[in-house]
Amino acid sequence: MNILSWNCRGLGNPQTEQELGDLIRAHSPSIVFVAETWLKKARLISLRDKWKFDGMIDFSREGRGGGVAVFWKKEMDFSVDTYSPNHIDAVINKGKEDEWRFTGFYGEPNTNSHFISWATLRRLKSKFSLTWSCAGDFNEIIRAHEKLGGR
């Protein structure tokens, strides 16, 4: 099983869509989490079908930016627990021996709001004692050379 997570900074760009499609074909992920989709639900459904995924959930963009989505294959018994503009939290194989948890996460881009992101992660962590895979863009900079553009 492979999981692919990408902050695409606008999936509506044809080059970005092509690059993500190439990654999907090359790695055959069972789950794909995408942050900053900048797309509405109808377009995400079209991409789900194009990339041959069986399921999808999204929190569509608000205003000009944002948006998170998860696509998954049917072999992943994907049960969404909670979602928001910044996360999608799900239990995989719910009630089975190999039950585990996946969270796709997009941290608050505004540094003054990072505390909200960390509070959300702490709340999510406390909900279950399952094995947990949390992937995404936390919008945290550890070293100055990591920062490109933005604020």
Functional labels for PLM-detected ranges:
Residues M1-R151:
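A shared catalytic/ligand-binding motif for oxyanion handling
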